[in-house]
Amino acid sequence: MTQDRPLLAVQEALKKCFPVVEEQQGLWQSALRDCQPLLSSLSNLAEQLQAAQNLRFEDVPALRAFPDLKERLRRKQLVAGDIVLDKLGERLAILLKVRDMVSSHVERVFQIYEQHADTVGIDAVLQPSAVSPSVADMLEWLQDIERHYRKSYLKRKYLLSSIQWGDLANIQALPKAWDRISKDEHQDLVQDILLNVSFFLEE
C-alpha cells in the first residue's frame, strides 16, 4: 500500500487538474463566441469609414451646407470602433487568464509527478487500467492542452495587435482571419481529452 501512495498522489493531482481545465474551457469558448460579433462590427465600421472616405461630400448638393460633416462622421465612427476594440481587449484578457490558470495547474501536476517519479517507477506510469488512461498519457494530454491555449492566445493577440485604423482593408478582413485561426486549430482537442478522462475522474 505504501508503494501505491506516490502513484495515488499523482493521480489525485490529475483529478484536481482536469475539472479546472473543463471549467476554463467553458470560459475560453464563451470569450471566443463573444469575439465573433465584435469582429463583424469592427469590419462593418471599417467598411463605412472606407465608403465615407471615397465619397466626395462637396459633390453632394445637400451636404455642401455641412463642410465639417465628413470629419465629424469619421470621428464618430472611430470612437465607435475604439469601444469595440476595448470590448475585444476584455475578451483577450479572459483568454490570457484561462491560459495562465491552466498553465499554473498543469505545472503543479508536473511538480507533484517529479517529486514522486523515482518512487512511482516507469511501469506504473505507463500502465492504464480498465477505466483510466495511463498517467503518462494524461500528463502528455495536459501538455497538449497547455500548448493549445498558449499558441491560440498568441495568434489571436497578434491578430488584434495588428489593427490600425489606417489600414481599413485589414480591419475588414478580420473576421475571416480570426476564422482561419480557429480552422487551423484542433477544435475538439480539449473536449476529446476531457472525454478520455471522464471515467478516471469518476473513480
Curated annotation (Swiss-Prot):
Q: Which domain of life is it from?
A: Eukaryota
| PTM field | Phosphorylated on serines by CK2 kinase.
Q: Which GO cellular component term is one of those annotated? A: cytosol
Ordered alphabetically, the record's keywords are:
Cytoplasm, Nucleus, Phosphoprotein, Ribosome biogenesis
Entry's Gene Ontology BP terms:
ribosomal large subunit biogenesis
> Could you confirm whether the keyword rRNA processing appears in this record?
no
Q: Where in the cell is it found?
A: Nucleus; Cytoplasm
Q: What does this protein do?
A: Part of the 55LCC heterohexameric ATPase complex which is chromatin-associated and promotes replisome proteostasis to maintain replication fork progression and genome stability. Required for replication fork progression, sister chromatid cohesion, and chromosome stability. The ATPase activity is specifically enhanced by replication fork DNA and is coupled to cysteine protease-dependent cleavage of replisome substrates in response to replication fork damage.
> Protein name, please?
AFG2-interacting ribosome maturation factor
Q: Give the species.
A: Homo sapiens (Human)
Its encoding gene is what?
AIRIM
